[in-house]
Amino acid sequence: MNLWKYYDGDLKYPDLNKHSHEKEISKTNTKWAFEYVSKHGKDEDLEPAIAKSTKGSYYYAKYILNAQPFPLGEKIIAKSAEYSYLYAAEILKKSFKLGEKAIATNAQYSFFYAKNILKKPFPLGEKAIATDAQYSYMYANGILNGPFPLGEKAIATSAEFSYLYAHDVLKGAFKLGEKAIATDYHYACYYAIYVIKTSFELGEPAIAKDALHSLRYTDIILKKDFYLDGKLIYKYKG
């Protein structure tokens, strides 16, 4: 075993008088312990050393124990949102209660924990989900199957997800998101056509920047000449 590659300037040398062979040396350091079991397979004597590392504990469960639980490492795995989710998804294949507090600090892992593991809402993670426009929309549309008021402030920062939230979830106007929608000619036009089904004056300056969307807005919504600030943008042809 090449111990030198783990030396980082701070690592103390093991006392070779106390460690007569490779396995005994490996007990002193998580990296060495994991390297040993990678070569020799599961070893309960080295598990306490491995259980000091979040990543090491997860990889031990996945690759050494062949995707079987590693109870000794669960306490440290539970400190990480990423590895708690992965442990639930790939090892336990069910909820990991001990790790839910950590998962709930991260929007992405909270959403996927709800979607892939719980297959239902994850209230503990909603505060984190609500910080992200995309995951707030996806949580509303795919998990709650209805409005997610806590996430609407984040959703309203995005033209894309404000439009999708209005169209797919609310199935009607999303006033809070109209300012963002109005910055994008595509979503402003489609918001008028497919959501509110009437003129969307706030979005007209953006729509006017694109010929194709001006045509659609004129023909489908206005059904009259499209003027903006006294300037003809598109002539209605009937």
Label every model-predicted segment:
Residues 2-238:
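Alpha-helical scaffold segments
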